[in-house]
């Protein structure tokens, strides 16, 4: 019986915590991160400030949790790409998935990349980087696979990490422009995005 009660309590806690995060995202969507305060969040979610602190340590922790949830959703989007595709095609597909996520979730996307949240310190080994579980690690493993298969050509000063950085910068730049400065601009962006990403992948390929 105690186990059943505990399970119900845990489910209720998770539901309430998610409701608070949803309310926080609504405030951020309407007025930006600066408008988020424990008082405003309490009014929106029908919790007292003290009640909110039962779930989160403060505003910064709430913003970090919203960002983490956004990153999880971005990663899930990228995982939909078929890893059995030829590696250049797979790299293209995960890039398109990244852009699509930004277009479908602009509030999450902008918050994730405009609010600085604490990051782990200390350098990770290449193997640790490849074993991670995030959108960047999906990209990193795709580049590693391309190098291992002899499709992508690593060069002095432009190896795995540099290739992954260049790929991320390319796709992120496209996504950010489309949800900010170029939102609503009359242009066939899908065609332009396709050409940009395919040309980038070709630039990584060896001459063999």
Predicted feature residues:
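Short alpha-helical functional segments enriched in proximate histidine and acidic residues
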Residues: 27, 73, 77, 81, ...
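N-terminal intrinsically disordered/low-complexity leader segments
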Residues: 1-15, 208
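Hydrophobic alpha-helical connector segments
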Residues: 65, 79-108, 132, 160, ...
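Helix-turn-helix
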Residues: 19, 27-61, 65
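Hydrophobic/aromatic-rich alpha-helical bundle segments in the mid-to-C-terminal region
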Residues: 109-110, 121-129, 148-197, 208
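An amphipathic alpha-helix signature
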Residues: 92, 96, 136-144, 161-164, ...
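Short, flexible, mixed-charge acidic loops at enzyme active sites
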Residues: 112-116
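Generic hydrophobic, amphipathic alpha-helix propensity
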Residues: 16-25, 41, 66-70, 74, ...
């Amino acid at each position: 019986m105690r186990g059943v009660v505990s399970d119900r309590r845990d489910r209720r806690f998770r539901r309430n915590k998610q409701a608070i995060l949803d309310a926080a995202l609504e405030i951020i969507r309407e007025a930006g991160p600066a408008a988020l305060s424990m008082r405003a969040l309490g009014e929106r979610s029908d919790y007292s400030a003290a009640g909110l602190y039962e779930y989160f340590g403060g505003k910064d922790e709430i913003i970090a949790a919203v960002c983490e949830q956004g990153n999880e959703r971005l990663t899930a989007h990228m995982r939909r790409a078929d890893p059995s595709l030829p590696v250049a095609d797979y790299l293209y597909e995960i890039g398109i998935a990244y852009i699509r996520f930004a277009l479908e979730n602009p509030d999450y996307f902008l918050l994730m990349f405009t609010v600085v949240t604490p990051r782990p310190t200390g350098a990770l080994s290449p193997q640790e980087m490849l074993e991670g579980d995030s959108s960047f690690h999906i990209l990193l493993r795709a580049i590693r696979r391309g190098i291992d298969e002899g499709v992508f050509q690593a060069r002095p000063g432009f190896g795995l990490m540099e290739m992954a950085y260049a790929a991320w910068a390319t796709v992120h730049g496209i996504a950010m422009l489309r949800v900010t400065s170029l939102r609503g601009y009359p242009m066939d962006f899908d065609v332009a995005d396709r050409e940009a990403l395919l040309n980038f992948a070709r630039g990584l390929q060896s001459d063999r």
